[in-house]
């Protein structure tokens, strides 16, 4: 038993070190969302007070998180966690980040720590969510993101944060759009939303792997409709910017276009930016030819557009 414990601990440490190797900026804190595991109905407790909610149910995955050579984290179950990054001088904004990965892993480097690197240099605090993989339990990723909001709202004043938005990429964009439309109260409602090449619909135009991994290979008509998030946009959906490429061969651009049309019908302010090229998965890298960076000379435009939009949201503070 003791040997098994040591082997398990070493595996977890190795996975953690692998993730750290891909981080451009070290988080100020890393917190497990369910410190006592998924089998206990508790989230994060501080000074005897429950700050977040319990896990709903276990997702059935066991063992340590896995990390591949690109820094993508998989097999996330008991070890779901959040990385918190607080800039030296916070400008009042914070973003909860949902990396993509088709609901089978989290792109923790290109769509996580690289986001934190860019944001903290602008004075924006960041919470990267390494959420549980559904594994047949479709409610769990959203519970994890909502718990991240609960934790960040609780500590916002001490961090100098007045506004908390959400950002997501690909399947993480589906999760961020879920957070933007399926929130349960003011605490879990994002103040703004950034969706980057997001999966939106689970109808014909969907990304097949994302849909199967969240709601299964033979989903009910109810689940398909419910998780097609163009159907969930309302007047209470936060203002949103969508950014993607016209030649995205993985996630049809109509996903974003249909979400934007739903926003227009409901009177939700927002912007839609479609770059000429770039494909899918270009993330937040600032290193030329790193990862799947296909934006080329449009990369500077992407950062300028997003930076301006975020600055404009901050003017309301």
Report the location of each language-model feature:
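Primarily recognizes the serine-hydrolase "nucleophile elbow" in alpha/beta-hydrolase
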Residues: 147-210, 224
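N-terminal cap/lid segment of alpha/beta-hydrolase-fold proteins
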Residues: 22-90
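Catalytic nucleophile-loop/oxyanion-hole region of alpha/beta-hydrolase
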Residues: 107-115, 128-163, 294-299
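C-terminal catalytic histidine-bearing segment of alpha/beta-hydrolase fold enzymes
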Residues: 257-317
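Conserved alpha/beta-hydrolase "acid-adjacent" motif
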Residues: 249-258
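Short beta-strand element of the alpha/beta-hydrolase
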Residues: 92-100
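Short beta-strand/loop motif that positions the catalytic acidic residue
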Residues: 236, 241-244, 248
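Mobile cap/lid helix-loop segments that gate and shape the active-site cleft of serine hydrolases
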Residues: 60-66, 198-232
């Amino acid at each position: 038993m003791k040997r098994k414990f040591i082997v398990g601990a070493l595996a977890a440490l190795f996975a953690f070190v692998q993730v750290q190797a891909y981080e451009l900026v070290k988080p100020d804190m890393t917190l497990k969302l369910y410190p006592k595991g998924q089998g206990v109905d508790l989230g994060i407790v501080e000074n005897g007070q429950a700050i977040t909610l319990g896990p709903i149910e276990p997702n059935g995955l066991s063992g340590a998180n896995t990390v591949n050579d690109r820094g993508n984290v998989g097999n996330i179950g008991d070890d779901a966690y959040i990385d918190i990054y607080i800039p030296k001088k916070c400008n009042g904004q914070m973003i909860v980040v949902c990396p993509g990965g088709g609901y089978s892993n989290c792109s923790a480097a290109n769509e996580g720590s690289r986001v934190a690197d860019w944001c903290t240099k602008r004075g924006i605090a960041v919470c990267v969510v390494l959420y549980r993989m559904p594994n047949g339990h479709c409610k769990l990723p959203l519970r994890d993101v909502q718990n991240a909001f609960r934790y960040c709202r609780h500590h916002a004043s001490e961090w100098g944060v007045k506004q908390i938005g959400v950002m997501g990429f690909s399947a993480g964009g589906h999760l961020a759009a879920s957070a933007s439309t399926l929130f349960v109260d003011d605490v879990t409602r994002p103040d703004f939303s950034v969706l980057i090449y997001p999966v939106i619909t689970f109808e014909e135009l969907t990304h097949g792997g994302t849909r199967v991994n969240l709601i299964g290979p033979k989903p009910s008509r109810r689940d398909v409709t419910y998780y097609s998030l163009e159907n969930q946009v309302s007047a209470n959906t936060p203002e949103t910017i969508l950014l993607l490429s016209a030649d995205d061969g993985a996630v049809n651009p109509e996903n974003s276009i249909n979400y934007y049309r739903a926003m227009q019908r409901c009177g939700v302010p927002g912007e839609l930016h479609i770059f000429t090229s770039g494909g899918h998965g270009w993330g937040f890298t600032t290193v030329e030819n790193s990862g799947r960076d296909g934006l080329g000379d449009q990369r500077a435009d992407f950062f300028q557009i997003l930076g301006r939009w975020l600055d404009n949201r901050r003017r309301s503070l």
